Amino acid sequence: DAMHWQLAEEASSYIGEAKNRYVRPIITREYDHSWNMFDMHLYPGGAWRLHMLRQLVGDDKFWAGVQEYVNTYAARTVKSLDFQRCIENHSGLNLDSFFDMWFRSKGYPILKSSFEYDKKKGLGKFTFEQTQVDTEKGIELFEMGLEIGWQDARGADHVDTVHLTKGTQIVNIKMDEPAHVMLDPNMKSLFEAEFNPGDDKLRHLLEHGKTVRGLMQAMSELAKTGKRKNLKAIR
């Protein structure tokens, strides 16, 4: 839980700077002064992307790549591509698209999300719209895996993974009617989202959720409603 709270704080610091001051790629050669690089993009923003990279390749391969990078380039001038190649050597993956999207491009995913449940078909329908696209700022669509967590009426927790590749995407997941649903229960992805699957489900998540991400999502969305019952649940 402590790590997840830290990740939430780091995401907030980075997103706050990107929304309220400026947005830039993590890796860039455009700056007025080198000190300008030591900002919320570089540290919390960069840390979050390394966290996602570790999730992608796995702990053992990630740290083996880091060790090769340190041992090979200690006391030498390096480029970000050197680090990328070390991780690729141990993961066996081509990471060009990941680094291009998350390190060499601007912004982060901003999702407008909704949920409906079809009792007859036993399907949960999730709609995701990426709203961060801004051609003037050079912010484009992202491709990302996103975990969806849900709890059934018996109290059992489930996690499904969806892959977002389009501006607007509908995903159907076979499930029993959930007591609550949430996005990214294990704090694996960097994004900002609006997601209210229903006030009753949010209150259930607030009371019975088991993750930091779930608690934060429930509190945030309930507060947005301004309803007395929901505000009382938060207190």
Give the positions of each predicted feature:
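Hydrophobic alpha-helical and helix-loop surface patches within well-folded domains
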Residues: 1-128, 181
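Beta-strand-rich binding/interaction modules
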Residues: 95-96, 106-184
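Amphipathic alpha-helical scaffolding segments comprising HEAT/armadillo-like alpha-solenoid repeats
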Residues: 96, 195-206, 227-234
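Extracellular/luminal regions of secreted and cell-surface proteins that mediate adhesion/ECM remodeling
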Residues: 113-115, 191, 203-204, 216
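Short acidic/polar inter-strand loop motif in beta-rich domains
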Residues: 185-195
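Structural detector for internal amphipathic alpha-helices that build alpha-solenoid repeat scaffolds
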Residues: 189-191, 213-227, 235
